[in-house]
Amino acid sequence: VLFIIFRKVILGIYAHGFSQEAMRLLNDYAVIIIWSIPFIASYSIFKAYLQIQNAKAISAIAQVVSYVVLIIALLLTFPSDIKLAWAAVMGHMVSFGVLLLFAFGKGFKYCPVLSLRQDYLKTMAIMIFPVFVSSVVSEVNSVADKFFASHYEAGIITSMTYGYKLSFSIQGIVSSSLVIIAYSSFTKKAAQNDLAGLNSQLYKCIQIVSWTVFPLVIGGIVIAGPIIQLVYGHGNFSGNSVNITAAIFSVYLLGVMPMCMKHIGDRICCALQRTDLAMYTALITVGVNIFLDIAMSKRMEYIGLVWATGIAILAGSIAVFIMLKTVDNKLSLRQVVKELIKPFVLSLIMGICVWIIQEM
């Protein structure tokens, strides 16, 4: 409700350099999309509940159902049609509904009365506050990036969005999926105060991620142009747009592995019930990013914004492991680096070979 009342002020900050027509369209879409927030929030809660119940695949099924709704909407409406925004809301509502049905099947019971005297509420509030701050800070970071990008030519924000989503989908597919599976083991080892066992699982997790992500990242950088041409090079997406997006995509890829490392480190912090460390990491990441946005965008324009994002993520990933070392004295940072070197070197050799073949 507050967003709807103050939407012009908020959108003015978010998209300062937009034209009048673009602002009008953004305003129309935002008023509709905002109603998906309750469904997204509820979806996240029930997703966590089902993961605890060892029903991790249900959230993937719910996502597929929401994608089906969006695809049907795309077939029935024009891409610029405002009905597409309502379809997005409908997709989130349907995915939440699917999770809710499975949650009831797993024994979930709804109590309409909230008792503030329950002991776990205080513990939950203490733990969730740093997570809440981290989320707010991350959103501020996103707004800052869009604010600076809105000052450049039309289509830059779109290219940055496409490049970001395509590159960091690697992180979503690889590290997020792995951490979802491993998180219960992390929390079990942390609850038993078995730091040696927790660190052993951490090293294995890093090993799996590095052997998977490094080849994809370096290979993606080498053949960035053909990838963007294949995925986005159709319709109104011109050759110049493909080149711009390919350059953005290549730079964003450099931040994928640091993002994976940061994601894993944040989950270890949560397992150790030190969510404050994740909050400090988020603050460091955003601080570095905004500083570099200001410094690099003046000389390198939009590419400077992309470099700023990658460097900030790297700073955050380094910070989270340094902080983890302060609470887990058995953690070997040397072992963490060791798990990264071999797959990086071999992936780099692979990338050089692919580049030579491509240039022949």
Residue ranges and their predicted role:
Residues S19-I45, F237-G265, Y280:
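Alpha-helical transmembrane segments of multi-pass membrane proteins
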